[in-house]
């Protein structure tokens, strides 16, 4: 194969994620949807809350930050509520990834990728 002078690699440009961050004060438990921001800063507002992930969709991900001002926890669960995946304490965040969807006959394709301590400023 001869070299034709064209670069065989395409260098990707920076990817922007408009609407990718959302901060919310919860008044009760929260069920996520696929049109929610992928990065969510949630304040429990005085009481621990349950967060139900969106219906499984292969390749979906969400990063949830517990931005509560006191020791209040977020319990993150599968979309069908069957399994708790993580408890995110104050000043922690959880990164979740979905590797299955309804086509795979899965109601619980979400996985915890990382539980990360954060510093809020």
Question: Can you describe what each PLM-predicted range is?
Answer:
Residues 96:
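Cytosolic nucleotide-binding catalytic cores of signal-transduction proteins
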Residues 1-76, 104-121:
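Exposed extracellular interaction/assembly regions and N-terminal maturation sites
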Residues 37, 89-93:
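Tight coil/turn sites that cap or link beta-strands
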Residues 78-85:
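Short edge-strand/loop segments of extracellular domains
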């Amino acid at each position: 194969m001869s070299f034709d002078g064209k670069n065989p690699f395409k260098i990707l440009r920076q990817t922007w994620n408009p609407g990718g961050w959302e901060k919310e004060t919860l008044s009760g438990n929260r069920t996520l949807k696929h049109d929610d921001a992928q990065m969510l800063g949630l304040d429990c507002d005085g009481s621990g809350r349950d967060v139900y992930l969106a219906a499984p969709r292969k390749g979906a991900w969400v990063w949830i930050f517990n931005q509560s001002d006191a020791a209040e926890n977020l319990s993150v669960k599968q979309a069908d509520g069957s399994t708790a995946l993580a408890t995110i304490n104050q000043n922690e965040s959880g990164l979740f990834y979905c590797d299955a969807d309804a086509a795979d006959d899965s109601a619980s394709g979400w996985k915890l990728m990382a539980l990360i301590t954060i510093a809020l400023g």
